[in-house]
Amino acid sequence: MASSEAEWVTIANNLLFKCHIHLRIHELQDCDANVFIALYQSILGEKVPDLIVLPRNQEDEAHNVQAVIDSLALDYLQVSLSHITGENIVKGDNESIRNLLEIFDGLLDYLTEHISESSPNKSETEQYSKDSHGEEAGEDLERTEEAKWRNASFMRCSFSSDTLGPTWDEDEAESTGEIIRLGDTAHTFSQRSNGAQNSKDLRSRKASASPGVEPPEEMLNPGPLGFLSQNGPPCEAASETPPMSMVPSARKLGEPIRAAIPLHPPYHPSEPRAPCPIGKEYLWSSRYLSTPTSGEHMAPSVEPDDAFLTSTLFKDDDQETYLPKPEATRTRKPSKGERDENRAAIPSEHLPFSQKARKPLTEQELHAMSEKLSQRLSELDWMLKTALGDRGTGETDGNDGDGGGEEVRSGNEEMLSQHSDSVMEYGPKKPRPGFSTCRKAPYRSHSLSPSSVNKHRQLEKEKKRQHKSKGTDSCHFQAKALTEAFERELRKHKVQENVGLRGIREEEEEEEETGKSYREVVPKGTSKRSQVQKTYSRKTAAPSPKGDGRLKSSKASPMKVSEHSLLSLMLEQFPFLYVSDPTLTKMWKQQMAQVEQLKREAQRENRSKKKLQDEIEEALRRHDLLTALVKKEYDHNKRLQDFRDRIQRQRLTQSKIKENRHQSVRARKYYDDYRVQLRAKMMKMRTREEMIFKKLFEEGLQIQKQRLRDLRNYAKEKRNEEKRQHQNELDSMENHYKDQFSLLAEAISQERQELKVRQKFQAQTLHKVKRELRAKMEKEIQQLQHMITQNDDDAFFRELEAERFKARLQLASFQYSKNPFPRGQTS
């Protein structure tokens, strides 16, 4: 490890020396943000986009390094560098620093080699243009230069970490596949399935990398624009582009798929960079960016559809049971586990400057990818169902008491605000008026001691504290979910404790109220009976007009019948009727029995929740039994003493008591005889009215029971309808996601077909150009050979001289014919 670290320190110092940067490092951890920013600016000749000039903390430095990595990945390499993050480099991770140094080293070597290769090519072309004669040689030179710049314009867009196209001797399909390709999307998806081979590939790549190793000579990418502007013809020579029918398809291949690559680790700026332009767009940008004032960074924003595709396809795998935030168009920062996964998921064939050819995405990988996405969608649906199930349990707990129900209601509304569109969809139902929510306990006259309840409350608080302390040690996202669950449990326990105390007190108050209402009903009946006795004793006439007016008013106004007020309401509606005490008592008992039966039916669902209350009642009952035993023994001793005293007093007053007894017996006998006679007399008159009243009371009980059953059935139907509606919403959501995934698969297959068509077309074009060049070269070679063979023949030269002399003679005779008799030649 020490020797390898020393080698990397040497590589870093050599890079700094070659770039004329006055910095020297002694350890690998000394390569901080300033070193990589200086390397970027000196090698590429541009400013780092989104650079924070004066970083104040470690996050700003991580942001600067991340900007360097993203600029390399998007603008130059066009490959995913998610295994290198700015945060790891600022922290001093040796693996990330070595990877980034290797990228800069290979980039610098490639650019220097390209410059050195382009300079002799330029001198050769100049010499060839000087020696060539005629128009054909000039046209050939122009064609070769145009072909070079066409290749250069294509190769700018395909600058990646793989082998960037073979030479002319290799297969033409492979070269066109390297020039025009789908991008890194398919490889980014397939990198996750290659986790088992990642560590071995990284080790082999490190072993093969060394300071003296040069980049492969077959790379045809011309590098950054600053170096290209010095070496070739001017930018006007590059104005010729591929046919216009190919440019829209290339743009379609470049832009949307580039937006789907997750190249946004932490500290990445919110504004994404533009995808790599192809064709005329890149030539236009090279014409203006190659000027000396081209240091600024142009970053048009990505369309909202692309951003939404990014946010929906690349979510965190370690997501908790809560739904994501509503702003789906913003790009999420991956978690630490995802960064580690991406760092380990880059095989050797996708690393920078590797010599392996990239393979297209197969159907099996697409199928596995769609299965992963569907599995993630089912997990999200399951999380939503579990969240809604927790809410349902909170609603059942909220119906235990009045005060506690309000707390649970508020807690359910808070939870529903996170999972549902409105609180009214799944909000707690109001309790029906005919039901009591607490079990009836035996009547006690003394106050309850809350010692056991306080102990239980303390135990619950201690458990909650321990649970909270454990939750704070976990991750931040898990802590948030645990605190919310803890708050729900706290509200549940508070409601149970309040119900435990309040239920017993309410039972006592309820018994007192029922006793009071019974005592109020019975005296009313007796007073009315006495009034009726007076009216019947005076005259047996029809009821007074007041009673008629009362009946009319009661018919006009709507009736409100509670669970205890049916009998009292009927007595108020029929004040002139006489009801005997046994019948009245029997009716009251029937009503109480029906109320108790309804209470028992309502409390069957809550028996499991009142287990703690039963234990408290059992302890209190034992306490009452012990107290009763002590009191009974004390009363027994006191009774014995009183009995002895009473015997002594009875012997003195026996005669007086005997006389008073005889008098009371005689008076009682007289009163009973009178009462029996009067009752027999009145029963004959009131039997019919009593039967009518009894029948009406039974019908009222049946109406009340039927009404409660209808209300219960209505509530059950509403709940079933809400469940059905919720299930329909879940099904529609699932169908929507399935449709989206099917559309995505169709788009990918269509783009692959278009890519194959373009590759085939370019292969045909290359074959045609090669055939034309070969035919032309063969023709020129044949002419040269023919000329060489003729130059060796002396007769050929003599014939040439003869023909030239003949031509001169013809010209001379033609001139002589114009002036046939010159003066100077007559003699």
UniProtKB/Swiss-Prot annotation:
It comes from the Eukaryota. Transmembrane segments: none annotated. GO terms for cellular component: centrosome; cytoplasm; spindle pole. Residues 123-145, 327-343, 360-372 have a biased composition (Basic and acidic residues). Keywords: Coiled coil, Cytoplasm, Cytoskeleton, Phosphoprotein. It holds the Pfam family DUF5745. Residues 115-145, 183-249, 308-372, 388-476, 489-558 are annotated as: Disordered. Residues 584-633, 701-795 form a coiled coil. The keyword Disulfide bond does not apply. The modification Phosphoserine is found at S447, S449, S451. Its main location: cytoplasm. Residues 187-199 have a biased composition (Polar residues). It is found in: Cytoplasm, Cytoskeleton, Microtubule organizing center, Centrosome; Cytoplasm, Cytoskeleton, Spindle pole. PANTHER family: CENTROSOMAL PROTEIN OF 95 KDA (PTHR22545:SF0). This is Centrosomal protein of 95 kDa. The gene is Cep95.
